UniProtKB/Swiss-Prot annotation:
Record localization: Cell inner membrane
Purpose of the protein: Transport of potassium into the cell. Likely operates as a K(+):H(+) symporter.
Protein name: Probable potassium transport system protein Kup
Segments passing through the bilayer: 32-52, 74-94, 124-144, 166-186, 193-213, 230-250, 271-291, 300-320, 322-342, 361-381, 390-410, 418-438, 443-463
The UniProt record lists the keyword Zinc: no
Species of origin: Polynucleobacter asymbioticus (strain DSM 18221 / CIP 109841 / QLW-P1DMWA-1)
Name of the gene encoding the protein in the UniProt record: kup
Topology term for the membrane: Multi-pass membrane protein
Pfam families given in the database record: K_trans, K_trans_C
Catalytic activity: K(+)(in) + H(+)(in) = K(+)(out) + H(+)(out)
InterPro entries cross-referenced by the UniProt entry: K+_transporter (IPR003855), K_trans_C (IPR053952), K_trans_N (IPR053951), Kup (IPR023051)
GO cellular component, as recorded: plasma membrane
Domain of life: Bacteria
UniProt family annotation: Belongs to the HAK/KUP transporter (TC 2.A.72) family.
Length: 647
C-alpha cells in the first residue's frame, strides 16, 4: 500500500472561510517613522536607477542622433512612465489589491485563487501566471545586484580611465562580501539603511536641482506631446529607446511586494513626498545638463558634480546600490519561503537571523545560488549597459503578471463593473505591453538571459507542484478511511503502551502510512495518539486562537489540524503548546514520540507527468529538506518509517 508523504495541504492552497484581516492602521507619527524606514528598504532599487537609465536611453547603439527634441522626448517619457506606471498603477490601484495587508506576486496569486474552484482550468492558469511571475522575479534578484553595483563602481572611470581595469574586480569583491554577510543577518546594519538612503535621495535631488536652475526650460518636458512626437518621428528606434526608458521603473514592484512590512500609507507618503520628487529632479537635471553639454551623455550621473565630488559620490552610490541589492536578496528569501509553504518549492533550510523581526530570514541554498549567478552575470556582461536589455525583460514580465492578477481581483473580489475593469486594466496593459515589446526587440542583446532563467525556474516549480498533486491523488486512491479503520481497530485493540504518539498526516480523513507501519512492526498503540495535519491558508498570518482545531475520536485518539499563513513558519513546539491550551491536554516531551513517513518516490508508467519530469520530481523529493528539521521536531523524539510510493 502506498500513500503520500505528509505535506502541508490536500490542495496547494486552502481557502479559509473567514479570517481576521491584517491591516496597518498607523497613526500619523507611526506612519512618518515607517515612511523613513521604508525609504531604506522599499525604494533602493528604483532609487538607484539614475545611475544607468538615461545613460542607456541615449546610447549611440540606438541610432538616434542627439538633439534637443530627443532630450525633451526622453525626459517626457520618463515623467509619464512615473506618473502612469508607478503613481497611478502601483501606488493608487495595485496596492489596494493586497492579501490581508500583504503584497507581492505570490500573495496576489493566492488572493486571485479564491475566485477559482480547486482543480479548475482557471485555477491552473492563475497558478501558472503567478509562478511564472515569481520565476521572473528571481531574474530580477540576479540582475539587480549586478547592474546596480557595477554602475556605481563604473563611476571610477570618470575620475580616471586608468581605473577602468579595477571596475570588475571591485564589483565582484563587493558582491561576494554582500552575500557572505547574509548568514549573520542585517538587523544591526539595517538600521543605517534608512538614513543612508535619505542622504542618497537628498543628494541626487540637489544634484538635479542645481542643473535645472541653470536650464529650467527642461520642465517643458512634462508636456506628453514631446514623448508622442519622439516616438512618431523615430519609429522603431524610438520604440527601442522606450525599452531603455523602462529602466527608470525597475524596482516599482518592490512598492507592492514590501507593503506587508510597512503598510500602504507609509509607502505612498515616501513615494509622493520624497522619492518621486528627488528622482524626477535628478532625471530632469540630467536632461538639462544634456542640453547644455551633450558630451556628458557618456556617464551623465557622475558628470553632474565637480570632479572633486566624484569619488565621495561613488562611495555613496555604492552604499545605495548595496542597500538596493540587499532588499532584493531579502525579497528572494521571503518569496522562496512563501513558495515552500504554498507548495511550489521543496522544503529547504530556513534560518531566522533576528529574534525580534520575524521576516528576517536566511536561506543558504538561495543565497549561494544567487551569488554564483550574479558573479556569472557580472563577468559575462562586463558593463552595466550590457545588462539593460536583460533587466528590462525580467521586470516587465513580472509587472504584466501583476496587472493580470490584479484584474481578476478587481472584477471578482471587488466586483467592479466589467467595463470599468476593462478600461482600467486595458490602459495599464497597453503601457506594460509596449514596454515589454520594446525590450523584446533587444532579446539577442541579453534579453534571452532572464527568459531562459525564468523558463528553467518555471519548469522546476511546476514539476514540484504537479508532482505533489500526484502524491495527493495517490494517497486518496490508495488510502484507508481513518474513522472506519480506528473503529475496527478498537474492536480488537492492540497492546496499549504509556506515552504519546504524534503522527504527521497529509489527510485528516485517511490513515497515515507511518501509523500503519508502527502497528505492523511494533504491534502496539500508545495510550494517546494524535494525527496532526498542518495546512497553509491563503493569508499571510493566522491568529493563535484560530490556529488549532481538535477532534476527539475517543479511546485517547485525536485528530488535530494546525493552520498557518504563507508568511509564517510551522513550529511543532508552538503547535504542542496550543494543543495543551485548547484542549487542556498535557504533553511530557520526554514521553512523546513523533512519527514521520520517509518515502521513496518511484517513477512509473502510471499516467501523470512525462517520465523525465517524474524523474526530476523524484530527484527533487529525495533532496528536499527533512520534515523533522522544517517542523523543528527534536531529533531524540523522532521516529521515521519508510514507504515506497509510485507515481
Amino acid at each position: 500500500m502506498s500513500v503520500s508523504n505528509p505535506e502541508f495541504s490536500e490542495s496547494s492552497i486552502l481557502r479559509p472561510v473567514e479570517i481576521s484581516r491584517q491591516t496597518h492602521p498607523h497613526k500619523k507619527g507611526a506612519s512618518i517613522a515607517l515612511m523613513f524606514a521604508a525609504i531604506g528598504i522599499v525604494f533602493g532599487d528604483i532609487g538607484t536607477s539614475p545611475l544607468y537609465a538615461l545613460k542607456e536611453c541615449f546610447s549611440p547603439d540606438h541610432g538616434i542622433p542627439f538633439s534637443a527634441d530627443a532630450v525633451y522626448g526622453v525626459i517626457s517619457m520618463v515623467f509619464w512612465a512615473f506618473a502612469i506606471v508607478v503613481s497611478l498603477k502601483y501606488v493608487l490601484f495595485v496596492m489596494r489589491a493586497n492579501n490581508h495587508g500583504e503584497g507581492g506576486i505570490l500573495a496576489l496569486m493566492a488572493l486571485a485563487l479564491r475566485t477559482a474552484p480547486n482543480g479548475s482550468k482557471r485555477s491552473l492558469l492563475i497558478i501558472m501566471a503567478g509562478v511564472f511571475g515569481a520565476c521572473m522575479f528571481y531574474g530580477d534578484a540576479i540582475i539587480t545586484p549586478a547592474i546596480s553595483v557595477l554602475s556605481a563602481v563604473e563611476g571610477l572611470e570618470v575620475i580616471s580611465s586608468d581605473l577602468t581595469r579595477f571596475v570588475l574586480p571591485i564589483t565582484v569583491l563587493i558582491l561576494v562580501i554582500l552575500f557572505f554577510i547574509q548568514k549573520t543577518g542585517t538587523e544591526v546594519v539595517g538600521k543605517l539603511f534608512g538614513p543612508i538612503m535619505m542622504v542618497w535621495f537628498i543628494t541626487i535631488g540637489l544634484m538635479g536641482l542645481h542643473q535645472v536652475i541653470q536650464n529650467p526650460a527642461i520642465f517643458a518636458a512634462v508636456n506628453p506631446m514631446f514623448a508622442i512626437r519622439f516616438l512618431i518621428e523615430h519609429s522603431l528606434q524610438g520604440f527601442i529607446v522606450l525599452g531603455a526608458v523602462f529602466l527608470v521603473l525597475t524596482g516599482a514592484e518592490a512598492l507592492y511586494a514590501d507593503m506587508g512590512h510597512f503598510g500602504i500609507r507609509p509607502i505612498r507618503m515616501g513615494w509622493f513626498f520624497i522619492v518621486m520628487p528627488c528622482l524626477l529632479l535628478n532625471y530632469f537635471g540630467q536632461g538639462a545638463m544634456f542640453l547644455a553639454n551633450p558630451e556628458t551623455i557618456s556617464n551623465p550621473f557622475f558628470l553632474m558634480v565637480p570632479e572633486v565630488f566624484v569619488f565621495p559620490l561613488v562611495i555613496l552610490a555604492t552604499a545605495a546600490t548595496v542597500i538596493a541589492s540587499q532588499a532584493v536578496i531579502s525579497g528572494a528569501f521571503s518569496m522562496t519561503s512563501q513558495a515552500i509553504l504554498l507548495g511550489f518549492v521543496p522544503r529547504m533550510k530556513v534560518r531566522h537571523t533576528s529574534d525580534r523581526e520575524i521576516g528576517q530570514i536566511y536561506m543558504p541554498f538561495v543565497n549561494w545560488t544567487l551569488l554564483f549567478l550574479v558573479i556569472v552575470v557580472v563577468l559575462a556582461f562586463k558593463k552595466s549597459e550590457n545588462l539593460a536589455a536583460a533587466y528590462g525583460i525580467a521586470v516587465t514580465t513580472t509587472m504584466i503578471v501583476t496587472t493580470l492578477l490584479a484584474a481578476i481581483v478587481m472584477r471578482v473580489v471587488w466586483r467592479w463593473n466589467t467595463i470599468l475593469v476593462t478600461l482600467v486594466i486595458g490602459a495599464f496593459l497597453t503601457v506594460d505591453l509596449a514596454f515589454l515589446t520594446a525590450n523584446l526587440l533587444k532579446i539577442m542583446e541579453g534579453g534571452w538571459f532572464p527568459l531562459l532563467l525564468g523558463a528553467i525556474c518555471f519548469l522546476f516549480l511546476m514539476t514540484w507542484y504537479q508532482g505533489r498533486k500526484l502524491l495527493r491523488q495517490n494517497a486518496v486512491n490508495n488510502g484507508i478511511e481513518l474513522k472506519g479503520f480506528i473503529d475496527a481497530l478498537m474492536q480488537h485493540p492492540p497492546h496499549r503502551v504509556e506515552g504519546t504518539a504524534l503522527f504527521l498526516t497529509a489527510h485528516v480523513d485517511y490513515v497515515p502510512v507511518s501509523f500503519l507501519h508502527n502497528l505492523k512492526h511494533n504491534h502496539v498503540l500508545h495510550e494517546r495518539v494524535f494525527f496532526l495535519k498542518v495546512s497553509i491558508w491563503d493569508v499571510p498570518y493566522v491568529k493563535d486562537e484560530e490556529r488549532i482545531t481538535l477532534r476527539d475520536m475517543g479511546n485517547g485518539i485525536y485528530v488535530v489540524r494546525a493552520v498557518y499563513g504563507f508568511n509564517e513558519t510551522p513550529d511543532m513546539g508552538q503547535i504542542i503548546e496550543l494543543i495543551e491550551k485548547s484542549a487542556d491536554l498535557k504533553f511530557d516531551m520526554m514521553n512523546t514520540s513523533f512519527f514521520l513517513s520517509r518515502d521513496t518516490i518511484v517513477s512509473t508508467e502510471i499516467p501523470g507527468m512525462a517520465m523525465w519530469r517524474e524523474r526530476l520530481f523524484c530527484w527533487m523529493y529525495q533532496n528536499a529538506g527533512r520534515q523533522s528539521d522544517f517542523f523543528k521536531i527534536p531529533a531524540n523524539r523522532l521516529v521515521e518509517l519508510g514507504a515506497k510510493v509510485e507515481i
